[in-house]
Amino acid sequence: MIPTSFPPREEIARLTARMLLEIEAVHFRPQEPFTLASGLPSPTYIDCRKLISYPRIRSTLMDFMAVTLLRDAGFEAFDNIAGGETAGIPFAALVAERLGLPMTYVRKKPKGYGRNARIEGVMTEGQRVLLVEDLTTDGGSKLSFVDAIRETGASCAHTAVIFYYGIFPETIGRLQAHGVTLHPLCTWWDVLAEARASGAFDAATLAEVESFLSNPRDWQDARKPADPTKSL
């Protein structure tokens, strides 16, 4: 069912952050930092994949995503909804259902047998495709999915995510340079504000998280493992 009411962006961001905290998808651990895929340390970690196990929350968030897209991209802006393998697939299916549109998904790489395709489902030349993912940090993985979509002759000018880190200033520019507009529901700053309001974390932890969010590169550089070759 297509949504017909449009909550303010600030309220969507606040409620999204609250739900992520409620299901304990948010983790703050400044004393024992997590290791990101890049190998760099981070005091924060978020697991949006948990959302699929909470029907009321996932339904509300998909309503939020649908109204965000209708308001910001247009009511007739898309012909196909594509999920990025693998975390984006369930969310793409839920958004496609709400918007009454076909759904496909994009592999990270060809599976190496059969059709050896990156696109699964029916995507045709000229279709306007929305890419759906669970989150984005610097936007890099989104561009690979967008390129795979465009190789079919379809267009892809928009990507929607539940969570956007919002701390790496180059992200939006990288996507825009590729002709892609990002539509997130909330960022780390929204989560930090809601975490403060909830009282779920101590002041020292929140201060360290804010230090990281304000200048992630410096925070990471100060905590990177020493290069053993430099002592030789």
From Swiss-Prot:
Catalytic activity: orotidine 5'-phosphate + diphosphate = orotate + 5-phospho-alpha-D-ribose 1-diphosphate
GO biological process: 'de novo' UMP biosynthetic process; pyrimidine nucleobase biosynthetic process
Record flagged with keyword Magnesium: yes
Residues noted as binding 5-phospho-alpha-D-ribose 1-diphosphate in the record, renumbered to the chain: 107-108, 111, 133-141
CDD domains (UniProt xref): PRTases_typeI
UniProt similarity note: Belongs to the purine/pyrimidine phosphoribosyltransferase family. PyrE subfamily.
The protein, known as: Orotate phosphoribosyltransferase
Natural source organism: Cereibacter sphaeroides (strain KD131 / KCTC 12085) (Rhodobacter sphaeroides)
Upper lineage: Bacteria, Pseudomonadati, Pseudomonadota, Alphaproteobacteria, Rhodobacterales
